[in-house]
């Protein structure tokens, strides 16, 4: 019996200022790396927007590149990345 290799992936947790365009910009950065988002969640707290994006089948290098680009967006305050091995 051959065991399947565990799926790699990353979860991005992003805190931003409230901005109508930020979700499209975050998703666009992931699309530029030719990846799809498996799950997304956004919570508006009236002060900030908290966004969670789960991206399967992505390696650590690409996830790091995306996180760096997210941090460069003007409205983004924090970016945390959890890499699943």
Where are the regions that the model predicts?
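A conserved regulatory-domain signal marking ACT and ACT-like small-molecule sensing domains
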Residues: 1-85
